[in-house]
Regions:
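N-terminal hydrophobic targeting signals that begin at the initiator methionine
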Residues: 1-2
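A structural signal for multi-pass alpha-helical bundles of membrane permease subunits
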Residues: 7-302
Length: 302
């Protein structure tokens, strides 16, 4: 048995060499830091080290739960993620369906490439472009509003606009890249089904609702489960570049709070406790969504 395993490894050694950097990256940057979660239960001192720092149990968690920012962070994180789920999740599916209907191969490739480009542009550049468009004095959007007789709006300084602006920016950046997996799913739908539907007199909408959407349903369900697992997770990079103290009321989320408390205020134990709480909530949502999908359907992650 041992020799058989070694023989298989030797036979596929080039594949193992190719995947080794990815495995090492995950071990070093994703799994190894998990050992540092113990500082969430300690009064961590950088000079004393993890082992010698005093153990304080759940004190950091209780401090967070009693914080004046707790409910604001929960509300903002949930609402921004929820809006992203409602408006952002269907966007790549719709775009993939539109791409799938394009008959001109060259035009299809060009439009797909254009839609993928924002994903590869630096977040700093993306937010910089967005800020320029929304600038109150020289921004394109405000110039259009002014030309139509309206008053210029300070979009990035008004709390009521922040969540909508973030969701719009996130959709614009990720919709093209997100459509790739749905295009792959669409390519696996059997063409014979469409031909049979046409023979039976079925039009576009009938093909869409009876063939196309059911054909990609397993992929949609898997992606939805993963998205629900991220319902309490909002990337801090874009928000940090977009928000200011004037928009904390609607834009401050758990990840940005962890960044400020941990890296700026150097309160590592408290920020670790907050991050751990967020991870537990995300894992719980993922398990619940997967269990519901497994109970009522045939598609699940495990």
């Amino acid at each position: 048995m041992h020799k058989l395993v070694l023989k298989r490894i030797k036979k596929s050694r080039y594949l193992y060499f190719m995947i080794a950097p990815v495995v090492i990256w995950y071990l070093v940057f994703c799994y190894a830091p998990m050992f540092g979660l113990v500082i969430a239960f300690k009064e961590y001192d950088i000079y004393e080290g993890v082992a010698n720092s005093p153990f304080i149990g759940l004190l950091q968690f209780r401090s967070f739960f009693s914080s004046i920012y707790f409910w604001r962070l929960i509300r903002n994180t949930f609402l921004i993620s929820f809006y992203g789920l409602i408006f952002g999740f269907p966007a790549p599916i719709i775009l993939a369906l539109l791409f799938n209907e394009l008959k001109d191969g060259r035009f299809k490739k060009i439009t797909q490439t254009i839609s993928y480009l924002p994903h590869f542009i630096s977040t700093v550049i993306i937010v910089g472009m967005f800020t320029t468009f929304l600038a109150p004095e020289t921004g394109l959007i405000n110039n259009i509003i002014d030309a139509l007789g309206g008053e210029r709006i300070y979009f990035l300084s008004e709390p009521k606009y922040f969540r909508s602006l973030y969701v719009i920016l996130d959709i614009w950046r990720s919709v093209g890249w997100g459509s790739i997996i749905y295009l792959a799913a669409l390519s696996n739908v059997e063409t014979e089904l469409y031909e049979a539907c046409v023979i039976d007199g079925g039009g576009y909408w009938r093909q869409l609702f009876h063939i196309t959407l059911p054909g990609i349903a397993p992929t949609v369900v898997i992606m939805l489960i993963l998205r629900i697992g991220q319902l309490m997770t909002v990337g801090y990079e874009t928000i940090i570049l977009m928000y200011s103290p004037s928009t904390y009321e609607t834009g401050d989320v758990i990840s940005t709070y962890v960044y400020r408390v941990g890296l700026i205020d150097s309160n590592y134990s408290f920020s670790s406790a907050v991050g751990m709480f967020n991870s537990i909530i995300s894992m719980t949502l993922l398990v619940c969504a997967n269990s519901i999908s497994k109970r009522f359907g045939e598609t699940s992650l495990w």
